[in-house]
Amino acid sequence: MKEELSIDIIGLAGACSYALDCIEAELVNIKNKHGKRVAYISICMAEYWKIQGDELQDLAMCALLHDNALTQYISEELKKDSVIHCKKDLSEKKTNLHCIYGEKNITKLPFKTDVSNVILYHHEHADGTGPFQKKWNEIPLFARIIHLADIIDIIRNSIDSDDNSWDFMCQYLSQNKDSPVSYTHLRAHETPEH
């Protein structure tokens, strides 16, 4: 009798995210579990969109692995240049490379819903100023949610003061012009003081 193989896909994605964190820590000394926080923020935002079931699972996996090719890009660059130069070179002009590689990588995963272009467009801004110049109505909702969660996590971890980071986030959100996603993020992360 042949036994069917069962895979805990969320556990697998979590393990991959952890492995990517370890590689990133080794290559460029970044040790912050960014993928897990982006996944958590994305899931909080998804509640307000009533995303659940298979869609929520796929959003969580995409958020965990949104930078899955960043280490691939970094390791390729390190073969050419030093760590210091590589960190400086992770500019928006090069951002599209890890999005392209990452989108290609996730096509091999067993998603239950259509996640086409989620990783590819996760650095797009609502006003069309991202690496691929896509406006919000051309970007999948999951990519918009992950982009905003990504920005929020980066801001929250790069500014010391919570008040300053909250003010900066509100300013970014008001300029981002993706009001439905921005609003849900603000609602998901409201604090009594704000």
Where are these regions (language model features)?
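Catalytic, metal-anchored helix/loop core of enzyme active sites in primary metabolism
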Residues: 129
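Conserved beta-strand-loop-short alpha-helix elements that form
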Residues: 144-156
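Acidic/His-rich, divalent-metal-binding segments that scaffold phosphate/diphosphate chemistry
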Residues: 1-116, 120, 124, 135-138, ...
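Amphipathic alpha-helical "output/dimerization" segments
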Residues: 57, 140-147, 171
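Long, mid-chain structured domain cores
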Residues: 101-102, 119, 170, 174-177, ...
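Conserved small/polar residues in nucleotide/adenosyl-binding loops
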Residues: 184-193
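Active-site-proximal, acidic helix/loop segment immediately C-terminal to a metal-coordinating Asp/Glu
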Residues: 153-178
